[in-house]
């Protein structure tokens, strides 16, 4: 049996609709919050673009999904780089984890002809920090309150000893496409969305396992040098 995941439109749904989808065999339910804060949501997905979508309604349906689908079977899409701080988006990631869900993260990449095509793509240093921090919160037991942030809301300390952080960075999984859990490992998404949020020349979410040269580039973008091994 092939697992079925739902990307919903909460604006047109009531709680019973969520139950019907579960009863029909859906396995995972997701909501495209996209924006990390109510203000950004309203500006980019709600009244600011003459849309009926509302932050309150999206969260209402997301909470219905938590009740009906259960732990680890619901989540939310989040786009990084729409004007939020790193602290704000990672606080949202933590909120989802505390509810029992997951975040499926995208790097903002302006599409020609869209209402936001004049905005810059998310800087790679910002994206890599959020990618790494999100992975630590979702899969490594680190909490956002274990991390430190500077006055601009940027991650300055990931809340892990350098050696442990190096191991996670070198594994590369934190920088792969995030989404519904895959067949072989919970932290490797079943959905790889090749180049869905970046050009192939500057990969944001790797649809494949990053190799050594990719990890070196990621480290440069993070500005985190690998700790030299301690001699015995």
Predicted regions mapped to residue ranges:
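Core AdoMet radical
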Residues: 1-17, 24-59, 75, 102-104
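Alpha-helix-loop-beta-strand connector modules within alpha/beta enzyme cores
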Residues: 1-5, 50-72, 123-143
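Conserved residues at beta->alpha junctions
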Residues: 8, 80, 124
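Conserved strand-turn element in the central/C-terminal portion of the radical SAM core barrel
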Residues: 11, 47-48, 61-87, 106-108, ...
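Catalytic cores of alpha/beta
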Residues: 14-23, 80-98
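A broadly tuned preference for mixed-charge, low-complexity surface segments
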Residues: 23-36, 60-64, 81-83, 128-139, ...
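Residue-level preference for alpha-helix termini and adjacent loops
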Residues: 40, 79-81, 179
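Auxiliary Fe-S-binding modules of radical SAM enzymes
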Residues: 90-232
């Amino acid at each position: 049996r092939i697992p079925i995941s739902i990307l919903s439109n909460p604006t047109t749904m009531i709680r019973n609709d969520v139950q019907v989808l579960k009863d029909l065999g859906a396995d995972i339910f997701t909501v495209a919050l996209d924006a990390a804060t109510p203000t950004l949501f309203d500006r980019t997905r709600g009244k600011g673009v003459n849309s009926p979508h509302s932050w309150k309604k999206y969260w209402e349906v997301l909470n219905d999904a938590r009740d009906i689908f259960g732990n680890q079977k619901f989540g939310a899409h989040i786009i990084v780089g729409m004007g939020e701080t790193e602290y704000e988006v990672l606080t949202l990631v933590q909120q989802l984890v505390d509810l029992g869900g997951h975040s499926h993260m995208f790097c903002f990449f302006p599409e020609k002809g869209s209402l936001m095509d004049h905005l810059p793509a998310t800087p790679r240093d910002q994206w890599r920090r959020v990618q790494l921090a999100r992975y630590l919160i979702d899969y490594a037991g680190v909490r956002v309150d274990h991390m430190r942030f500077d006055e601009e809301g940027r991650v300055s300390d990931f809340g892990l000893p350098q050696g442990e952080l190096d191991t996670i960075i070198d594994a590369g999984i934190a920088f792969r496409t995030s989404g519904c859990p895959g067949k072989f490992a919970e932290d490797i998404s079943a959905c790889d969305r090749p180049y869905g949020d970046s050009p192939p020349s500057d990969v944001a979410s790797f649809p494949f396992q990053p190799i050594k040269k990719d990890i070196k580039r990621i480290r440069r973008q993070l500005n985190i040098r690998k700790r030299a091994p301690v001699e015995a």
